[in-house]
Amino acid sequence: MRECISIHVGQAGVQIGNACWELYCLEHGIQPDGQMPSDKTIGGGDDSFNTFFSETGAGKHVPRAVFVDLEPTVIDEVRTGTYRQLFHPEQLITGKEDAANNYARGHYTIGKEIIDLVLDRIRKLADQCTGLQGFLVFHSFGGGTGSGFTSLLMERLSVDYGKKSKLEFSIYPAPQVSTAVVEPYNSILTTHTTLEHSDCAFMVDNEAIYDICRRNLDIERPTYTNLNRLISQIVSSITASLRFDGALNVDLTEFQTNLVPYPRIHFPLATYAPVISAEKAYHEQLSVAEITNACFEPANQMVKCDPRHGKYMACCLLYRGDVVPKDVNAAIATIKTKRSIQFVDWCPTGFKVGINYQPPTVVPGGDLAKVQRAVCMLSNTTAIAEAWARLDHKFVLMYAKRAFVHWYVGEGMEEGEFSEAREDMAALEKDYEEVGVDSVEGEGEEEGEEY
């Protein structure tokens, strides 16, 4: 089997985890107590969903997941919630005091007290796997636990499981809406630390998702539940090919192979379509061509940036539901004729396509309409450098005055780490810039030194 272990870190990670596992259970027909009436092979078997769930002899399905937070309140909600019987109590790990939005606390002081326990639990999960494929790490950039503890964990996972792929789903600080003043510090420190340990990071920005909820679902005041349910649809689309049998399945390492042209340039944009409320869906026929087109609309992206200003390096379309390759090819042919979609000249306009026959499932009482087909597009585009540039700018403004730095230094960090992280991010921006430049003058020599 090709198992995946999900690791949910900090409040954002845990709450997205709740939404994802709720959706997985609905998709596979697993009840909140872990029983699965449709499963005939008790205690194992080679069903595709066993990549995400392990089975006990009694026929209970247990998620291959770990929830970690440095303070207990958020995970306590899981312990008392609807799905409390689904998780093994050892999978829900909490500390006593939180990281207080401070990367240094998550990474050094508080984080190191709990890291060995977490790795021990992950080791137990890994031992139950026959062919562990990799890890999915869910976290936010802005929080102390999400940034600090995740980067510590990624470093340790690289040591313990060197060859396994590690994919991140990161909540990127929204341009306008901020939940903490020190978000730019935490984000840049964590990106710098995890850059070499992460194979692929899908970024999601709350503001982009707020706008999608407002615009497409007519929710006036979206809550985190609305946001997380939308995020979970995307995560589900990305992982569907690991959990179901399909026509064109895509596996974890395949994403990396097709989306990451250079090791550092591993931040694909996710776009999902159709995001539509039940009232609207009733009057629209969402053909393959329509939903494919919708993916190239900046309005449907999960990060605020404009791909029309950047160039695409790679593109991966994951369809699910009633979709046949013929329709997909026609839709892609139409896309290629459009001038607004530019590829870098060193990359043939390749689209990787995955097709899965399992139609998208929706949470009952949720906001999304039940549709016959959906598509999730993962595209690696130079436009995402806009997002980094915005963040770097905020970082520089604060760091020029050394604002809030004493909180980090007081927890055992050195000031040099800030400038080091800043330089690394500047280099990342530069990398994106160079990748987008047309390779006319035979750029062989300068690429040699970077990679």
From Swiss-Prot:
Motif range (MREC motif): 1-4
Active site: residue positions: 254
Positions of modified residues (N6-acetyllysine): 40
Binding site for Mg(2+): 71
Record-listed cross-link Glycyl lysine isopeptide (Lys-Gly) (interchain with G-Cter in ubiquitin), residues: 326, 370
Reactions mediated catalytically: GTP + H2O = GDP + phosphate + H(+)
InterPro entries per the UniProt record, alphabetical: Alpha_tubulin, Tub_FtsZ_C, Tubulin, Tubulin/FtsZ-like_C, Tubulin/FtsZ_2-layer-sand-dom, Tubulin/FtsZ_GTPase_sf, Tubulin_C, Tubulin_CS
PROSITE patterns: TUBULIN (PS00227)
Cofactor(s) it depends on: Mg(2+)
Example of a GO biological process term: microtubule cytoskeleton organization
Cellular localization per UniProt: Cytoplasm, Cytoskeleton
Entry's EC annotation: 3.6.5.-
Entry keyword Membrane: no
List of residues that carry 3'-nitrotyrosine: 282, 451
Residues with Phosphoserine modification: 48, 232, 439
Binding, GTP: 10-12, 15, 71, 99, 140, 143-146, 179, 183, 206, 224, 228, 252
Modified residues (N6,N6,N6-trimethyllysine): 40
SUPFAM superfamilies in UniProt: Tubulin C-terminal domain-like, Tubulin nucleotide-binding domain-like
GO CC list: cytoplasm; microtubule; microtubule cytoskeleton
UniProt entry keywords in alphabetical sequence: Acetylation, Cytoplasm, Cytoskeleton, GTP-binding, Hydrolase, Isopeptide bond, Magnesium, Metal-binding, Methylation, Microtubule, Nitration, Nucleotide-binding, Phosphoprotein, Ubl conjugation
The protein's role, per its UniProt record: Tubulin is the major constituent of microtubules, protein filaments consisting of alpha- and beta-tubulin heterodimers. Microtubules grow by the addition of GTP-tubulin dimers to the microtubule end, where a stabilizing cap forms. Below the cap, tubulin dimers are in GDP-bound state, owing to GTPase activity of alpha-tubulin.
Domain notes: The MREC motif mediates interaction with TTC5/STRAP and may be critical for tubulin autoregulation.
Protein's UniProt name: Tubulin alpha-1B chain
Organism whose genome encodes this protein: Pan troglodytes
